[in-house]
Each structure stands twice: as C-alpha cells, then as structure tokens.
From Swiss-Prot:
This is Trans-enoyl reductase thnE. Gene3D superfamilies: Medium-chain alcohol dehydrogenases, catalytic domain (3.90.180.10), NAD(P)-binding Rossmann-like Domain (3.40.50.720). Substrate binds at residues 140-147, 289-293. One of its GO terms (molecular function) is oxidoreductase activity, acting on NAD(P)H. The lineage of its organism: Eukaryota, Fungi, Dikarya, Ascomycota, Pezizomycotina. NADP(+) binds at residues 53-56, 179-182, 202-205, 220, 267-268, 358-359. Its EC number is 1.-.-.-. CDD domains: enoyl_reductase_like. It catalyses: malate + 6 malonyl-CoA + acetyl-CoA + 2 AH2 + 2 S-adenosyl-L-methionine + 5 NADPH + 9 H(+) = trihazone A + 2 A + 2 S-adenosyl-L-homocysteine + 6 CO2 + 5 NADP(+) + 7 CoA + 6 H2O. The gene is thnE. Keywords: NADP, Nucleotide-binding, Oxidoreductase. InterPro entries: ADH-like_C, ADH-like_N, GroES-like_sf, NAD(P)-bd_dom_sf, PKS_ER, Trans-enoyl_RdTase-like. Pathway: Secondary metabolite biosynthesis.
Length: 368
C-alpha cells in the first residue's frame, strides 16, 4: 500500500473513547491507531460533534472495546493508495467527515479518537472560511439528509444536478424537525435542488430554519399546525421527511400530506399504527444511514442491515455533490455550542445529550 505519509511516522497507539457496556465508556490511553486501508485517509482530530445516535448506540447496542463517535473535523496526516491516485485530497488538508462509530466489525475506527480512519469519499475538504469547530457538525447530517431525500424518498432529480440556480420545481417538501442538524441540511439541499421546503420547529428556531432556506415554518406545538401546512401547500403536499420520528411528528406529517397522498420517510422507526391510517395513499418507510459505509450493520433488531454496495456508492456520490456546493460557497454550517475539556469534555457532552437533547444547535468539543 502506498500513502503520502507512512504509518511508521505516526504513533501506534492513541487516546480514544471506547465503549465498555450499555451506557458505559472509558477514555483509553493506548487504543490502536486505525490501519490505513487503500480507500481511507487518516485524520488528526481537532474537533468532534456529539449526536443523539452516539448515546442511543452506546445505551442500547454497545460494542465493548470499539471507539465511539461519528462526526469529526481535523487535518489529514496520511492517505491510502486509492486516495492518493484520486488526487482530490492531500496531507495537510483541513477536512470534516463521518465514520461509523462503535462498529464491532471495525472497532479501531471512531470519531472520538486522536486519529480517525475515514473513507476518503466520505470526507469534505473545507474552504478557508469554515472553521474546524463549525465543520464538525457537517458529516452525519449531510449523509443522513442526502440519503433520506434522494435515495430513500427518491425525489425527482439527480444529486449531480444540485446547484444554486436550478429553477423551482414547485414541489413542496415538509421537513419535520427543521431545526435539527439533519433538518437544516435537508432544507438547504432541497432549496438548492429547486424544491420548496417547508418545515416545523419551535418558534424560537423559526429564524434559524428560514436562514437555511425554508419558505415557511410552522409551530409543531400548535394544534392547528397540520391544517396550516395543508392550507399553505394547497392540500398538495406529496413529500415529508421526519427528522424526529416520534409519534407526534409522524401523526403531524400524515395529517399534513395532501389529499392525494404521497411519501413519508423517517430517520428512525415510526409508529405503524399511525401509518395504517392512510396505508392506501401514503407510502411510508424509514432508513438506517449506516449502510453508506458499505459494511454489514450489526445492530440489534430492526436496525440491522446487510452490506449494500448500492448505498456505499450513493454515499460517495452525495458527498461529491455536497463538496461541489461547498466549493462554491453554498453550504451553511449548523449552529454549534462549543465545549472545552478535551476527551473529558466529550464524555461530559454525551451525558449532557442523554439528559437534554440539543435544540437548534450541535454540541461540539475541541480535543486538540
């Protein structure tokens, strides 16, 4: 294997946060630095973002000994042979990306570590105006929003046609949970692709959601929310992306979809009893974005997935499309709340998200 920087120049061991058991983790000082595969880059981590999935995975499907974490940003220190040949990335590049954290099939790869081994085509090269702190929130939200909209929902139009000048198609798309990191990324992608995004959030986040491109935002606390959406969309809403996937949001989406029916896609399993209410007119599904790494997903129950080359290829295409937008200055970063404290701060952040999920911001920790 050829690489721009040999593994011999790098440490054999690192500090990382690894799973111990359900809800339990530890800061390990001698975790292995991941081996550099031909299609990977090795990144010296500067910042990490903490996601609800980090908590859920640790609490309900832990892989003892595996490194935790999905979202990271930092500087490339080594490239695998395929990444070298591609020529897009180089040692010293500032990047943000996403890895499958706490994977029992690849336990030495996770974001909460000094060095992250990431697939080269699932990292974004950062322009100078985006800081490593802000960039830490890009990876998982990008992967999830793109997959939900353009793969699972199969919205008309191709990823490689994303631009800032696509004529409006006139198709409304509802984003429930518009102030989440996935929600704001979905809204921006929809707007860029020529759709008309509308969203739900709490009133305190209305301006945030509009900043990302939602043409109308509705208060999900309002009992008349679904009726207001139906009125705004002329009872013709065909598509709904549910970034929350709780019973209340599923019910709201179903009530907002137009008289002719349409498509409901959720980021988590949803209440089937609600879906039965319009089974003949609304096609409903949910997805597990972890398939974009092209490996078997060994999680419990309905979260398990077989390896999918198709999803692996889609993940690469979606990041290439977003990279093009990023290069042209058409990507806005989600608000963050910055924590200090290094790896101890990350552990504290996981506990904080477990007790109080963030609203309108992503929790980011500086680790270097």
């Amino acid at each position: 294997m050829s690489s721009a920087t040999t593994m011999g120049q790098l440490p054999q061991h690192q500090t990382a946060i690894v799973a111990q058991g359900p809800g339990q983790m530890t800061i390990q000082k001698d975790a292995p630095v991941p081996a550099l595969a031909h299609d990977m880059v090795l990144v010296k981590t500067a910042t990490v973002a903490i996601n609800p999935v980090d908590v859920k995975s640790l609490d309900y499907s832990p892989a003892p000994g595996a490194i935790i974490g999905f979202d990271f940003a930092g500087t490339i220190v080594a490239l695998g042979s395929d990444a070298v040949k591609e020529g897009r990335l180089a040692v010293g590049d500032r990047v943000a990306g996403v890895v499958y954290g706490m994977d029992r099939l690849q336990p030495d790869v996770g974001a909460f570590a000094q060095y992250v081994g990431a697939l080269a085509d699932l990292v974004l090269k950062l322009p100078d105006h985006i800081s490593l702190e802000d960039a830490a929130a890009l990876g998982l939200a990008t992967a999830t929003a793109a997959y939900g909209l353009f793969k699972e929902m199969e919205l008309p139009g191709a990823l490689d046609r994303l631009s800032s000048s696509v004529p409006d198609r006139g198709d409304f798309v509802l984003v429930a949970g518009g102030s989440t990191a996935t929600g704001t990324r979905a809204i921006e992608l929809l707007k860029t692709a020529g759709f008309r995004p509308v969203a739900t959030s709490s009133p305190s986040n209305f301006e945030l959601v509009k900043k990302f491109g939602a043409e109308a935002v509705f208060d999900y606390h309002d009992p008349g929310c679904a009726d207001a959406i139906k009125a705004y969309t002329n009872n013709e809403l065909d598509y709904a992306l549910d970034c929350i996937a709780e019973a209340e949001t599923t019910q709201l989406c179903y009530a907002a979809i137009g008289r002719a029916g349409g498509r409901y896609v959720a980021v988590e399993p949803f209440r089937e009893s609600i879906a039965q209410s319009r089974i003949n007119t609304v096609k409903a599904s949910w997805f597990n974005v972890m398939t974009v790494w092209g490996r078997k997903v060994e999680l419990g129950g309905e979260y398990a997935r077989e390896a999918s080359l198709e999803d692996r290829e889609f993940g690469a295409r979606s990041f290439a499309a977003v990279q093009a937008l990023l290069d042209r200055g058409y990507v806005t970063t989600h608000p963050i709340k910055l924590m200090s404290g290094g790896w101890e701060g990350v552990v504290e952040g996981v506990a904080k998200i477990r007790s109080q999920p963030p609203s309108g911001y992503k929790l980011v920790c500086q680790v270097a």
